[in-house]
């Protein structure tokens, strides 16, 4: 926790170097105060969540659609302590005194990203920064047909004008019941540019909303403020919909075309277990993937409901794999479900890498291991 210094911000090459305990909120506040023209991609997580922790789990955020994918793909360099106690640097910082890139060197950073702490301990991170435009707006497109999702999302992505694209459906609040919502955030440096982007984003939906089966929702100022937040707080507010403060979810990385099937599966699972839901996705890359969430709130004092949610979560992990997705940030049970479906040669390679880096087997035993 004491390793929380922001060591460098390079305004020209757009990167920051931070210690592993630096939180998302700390970096965001520091940039707003000292480098207001720059920002980093913020996950929908509490401000205390760390930069290093989020990149290590392949996290994503409000710039993942427009600026390069998962946060692990925004890493420009790492400093890591190996299980043997050796300190190593990875990326350009290993060769020259700057943290600007992982290329063109052999990319060893992947040995410590997604491994659940089984290969080493990250102590410093180089992370990409991005310009902070002056203007920010949002459009909300409503549909009644889940199968329209891939088409709607593809059209928005195709404009190359959205900063963040999110899709959601839930039985609460009441205005969402029976509808699906695509939230499109976009930015600009001038009012003219903002107006042009707004017009273009609306135009690509014209043939759809002229049928009156879908359309743009008017967004009043109080609602717009929430949509413009980064990180988004809507899910944390949804956590208390059962008035008990309990909330768990399964995230799954999957192809965009599987979103309709994932929505149906989530509704079927919750109906079987007698619980409620919020379902949705954030687009990663320019349409390369989606981080789909199956979110289940519950009353923590209702132990029967707690057990039903646990069973629903277990079923959801298996369902995500069956849909062609991969459970994200999963616990040991979910990891084992992934490994059962993984190519044997891939898992054998993972074991060999761990044996080389951690010959004594001391780093997070139980993670990424077959039961």
Model-identified regions with their sequence ranges:
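Glycine-rich N-terminal segment of FAD-binding domains in flavoprotein oxidoreductases
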Residues: 1-3
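FAD-binding subdomain of flavoenzyme oxidoreductases
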Residues: 5-9, 19-156
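Short glycine-enriched loop/turn motifs at secondary-structure junctions
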Residues: 9-13, 133-137, 178, 244-246
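Catalytic cores of large soluble enzymes that bind and process phosphate-bearing ligands
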Residues: 15-22, 43, 47, 66, ...
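Feature of Fe-S/electron-transfer and energy-metabolism proteins
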Residues: 30, 256-257, 370-371
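Acidic/polar loop patches that form or flank catalytic/metal-binding clefts of enzymes
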Residues: 39-41, 87-89, 162-166, 209-215, ...
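C-terminal substrate-recognition/cap domain of FAD-linked oxidoreductases
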Residues: 141-315, 323, 330-334
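Activity-critical C-terminal alpha-helical subdomain
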Residues: 329-371
């Amino acid at each position: 926790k004491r390793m929380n210094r922001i060591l460098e911000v390079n305004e020209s090459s757009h990167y920051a170097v931070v210690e592993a305990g630096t939180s998302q909120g700390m970096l965001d506040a520091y940039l707003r105060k000292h480098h207001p023209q720059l920002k980093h991609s913020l996950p929908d997580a509490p401000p205390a969540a760390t930069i290093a922790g989020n990149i290590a789990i392949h996290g994503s955020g409000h710039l993942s659609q427009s600026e390069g994918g998962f946060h692990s793909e925004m890493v420009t360099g790492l400093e890591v302590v190996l299980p043997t106690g050796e300190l190593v640097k990875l990326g350009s910082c290993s060769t020259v005194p700057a943290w600007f890139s992982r290329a063109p060197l052999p990319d060893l950073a992947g040995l410590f990203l997604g491994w659940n702490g089984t290969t080493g301990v990250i102590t410093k991170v180089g992370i990409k920064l991005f310009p902070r435009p002056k203007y920010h707006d949002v459009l909300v497109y409503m549909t009644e047909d889940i199968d329209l999702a891939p088409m709607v999302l593809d059209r928005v992505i195709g404009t190359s004008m959205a900063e963040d694209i999110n899709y959601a459906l839930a039985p609460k609040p009441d205005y969402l019941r029976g509808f699906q919502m695509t939230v499109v955030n976009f930015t600009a440096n001038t009012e003219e540019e903002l107006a042009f982007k707004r017009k273009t984003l609306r135009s690509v939906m014209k043939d759809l909303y002229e049928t009156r089966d879908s359309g743009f929702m008017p967004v009043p100022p109080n609602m717009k403020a929430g949509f413009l937040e980064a990180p988004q707080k809507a899910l944390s507010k949804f956590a208390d919909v059962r008035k008990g403060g309990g909330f768990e979810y399964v995230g799954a990385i999957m192809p965009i075309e599987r979103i309709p099937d994932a929505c149906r599966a989530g509704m079927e699972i919750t109906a079987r277990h007698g619980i409620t839901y919020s379902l949705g996705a954030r687009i990663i890359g320019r349409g390369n993937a989606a981080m789909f969430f199956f979110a289940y709130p519950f009353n923590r004092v209702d132990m029967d409901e707690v057990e039903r949610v646990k069973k629903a979560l277990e079923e959801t992990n298996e369902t995500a794999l069956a849909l062609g997705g991969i459970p994200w940030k999963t616990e040991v049970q979910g990891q084992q479900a992934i490994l059962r479906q993984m190519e044997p040669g891939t898992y054998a390679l993972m074991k060999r890498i761990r044996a080389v880096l951690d010959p004594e087997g001391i780093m997070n035993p139980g993670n990424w291991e077959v039961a």
